[in-house]
Amino acid sequence: MIDENLIHKALANPFRREILSWLKTPKQCFVQGYGDPGCGVPLNAIHARSRLSQSTVSAHVAVLIEAGLLVSTRVGQWMLLARNEEVIHAFATQISLHL
């Protein structure tokens, strides 16, 4: 079950919405190839694109992960991030049913 309140809070910030948008089309938004596209994009690539401090980006990513909108996978020293399409779809469905 999704926590709609957490998702609303996460989506209230424009930069977090931008991260989700970038991860929707990672090949278009990130110049460097990252191997298996199903694994996600490294956190440092999001940091580099945003030009914000690493701690700021990490804090925003943590909110998206807590809300269930992002999935993180650790591969060695890398933290790879991907959209959680199942949760995003469920949330969009809930919104369309209730509003």
Where are the predicted features?
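Short, Lys/Arg-enriched N-terminal segment that forms or immediately precedes the first helix
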Residues: M1-H8
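N-terminal helix-turn-helix DNA-binding core of bacterial DNA-binding proteins
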Residues: K9, P14-S53, M79-E86
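The C-terminal cap of the DNA-recognition helix in HTH/winged-HTH DNA-binding domains
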Residues: A48, I65-E66
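Short, hydrophobic-biased segments on the C-terminal half of alpha helices
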Residues: V61-A62
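Beta-hairpin "wing" of winged helix-turn-helix
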Residues: E66-V75, A82
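Short, charged/polar, Gly/Pro-enriched secondary-structure boundary elements
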Residues: V87-F91
